[in-house]
Amino acid sequence: AGDVITQVNGTEITGSSDLVSLVSEAAIGNTVTLFMAVSLGFTTVLVAAVRPLVGLIGVPAEAVPGTVQYLTICFIGIPFITAYNIISSVFRGLGDSKSPMYFIAVACAANIALDILFIGPMALGPVGAALGTTLSQTLSVIVALFGIRRHKTGLRLSRQNFRPRKGVLGRILKIGLPVAVQDGCIQVAFIIITIIANHRGLIDSAAVGIVEKIISAMFIVPSSMLATVSALSSQNLGAGKPERAAQTLKYAAMIATGYGIAVVLVIELVAEPLLGCFTTDAAVVLMGCQYIRGYIVDTIFAGIHFSFTGYFAACGKSYIGFLHNIIAIVLVRVPGSYLASRLFAGTLLPMGLAAPAGSLLSVMICVAAYRWMKRRGTLYTAA
């Protein structure tokens, strides 16, 4: 939702004398209608199908009850994730990329604090982890709502704006469908990797699960680069300043790389105590440290290809982001994780390295596509 409406609004309202046009209001209203309906539908279906899904992913028998509780709570939180993304995308589409960053910071800090509280002193286990995620998302929505009330956006949304319009929904889906399918494929890849880890036993499964929670927090900055670059680049392209859009990509990639290197260094130093915040099982901590020390390198490369994906979406070429992710998943991430799991039964480090290897391939594809289209003069062709 966030990337779709950010790009639609950014290209339509920037460069005009009136910041908010009727078209952008219709885009916002139709986005709310579309994505909230989809999120409620997904919530209903997933909560109803949670037990079959747990059986499908091969969760160890002793972990099934906790997994069912965890997923049920997380599925209930889907509408809150959607609401947060919609509100943040409105800010980005209007040129304010700082406010969503603050909302993300609140969610990140709350998630970490609540996870430590619920899983540590309160010993709630999987339920605590799920509550930490869902409550932090809810808090970010509340903060975002306060933010949008205080921010003078100039929006005048009426009931008409929320009524589905074929033309508006068509543009939203044209831009957003490749991004949505791309994200869906990434999540499917994560599920497959989780299944691979589950078949290695309870210790490895628990280690991978904890690391995924930590990685999700560490990835807030790299993943936000997609929407940020998309918003700023689309605004500059809409204002007829493609050179500034290219500079946005350049500096975003530099920031993402710097952040990734810093995170890698920190994790290398504090992996053991960090994992120890989530479990007292020495075996889980050991395997988790191996996995995260490989996986964390992905923060460097992922931030770069997220930046390129946002830039390509602003240029009306969101299909490139879809293609490079599919190629990386099919050729590297999933087969790499599977082979590492089979060939290195005593360590999770090689399995963790499959993720950054896939992202490195994505970066190579993005750079090649950028240079090729720039030479041909086709970068800024409208979608």
Mark where each language-model region is:
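C-terminal recognition in membrane/secretory proteostasis and scaffolding
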Residues: 1-36
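Short alpha-helical transmembrane segments in multi-pass integral membrane proteins
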Residues: 37-77, 121-177, 233-298, 341-383
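Small-residue-rich hydrophobic transmembrane alpha-helices
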Residues: 37-44, 81-100, 194, 207-265, ...
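Residue-level hotspots within pore-lining transmembrane alpha-helices
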Residues: 41, 45, 75, 79-80, ...
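Hydrophobic/aromatic end-of-helix segments at the C-terminal termini of transmembrane alpha-helices
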Residues: 50-53, 114, 188-201, 229, ...
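Transmembrane helical elements of multi-pass membrane transporters/channels
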Residues: 73, 107, 136-140, 144, ...
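Short runs within selected transmembrane alpha-helices of multi-pass transporters and secretion channels
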Residues: 73-92, 100-108, 129-142, 223-226, ...
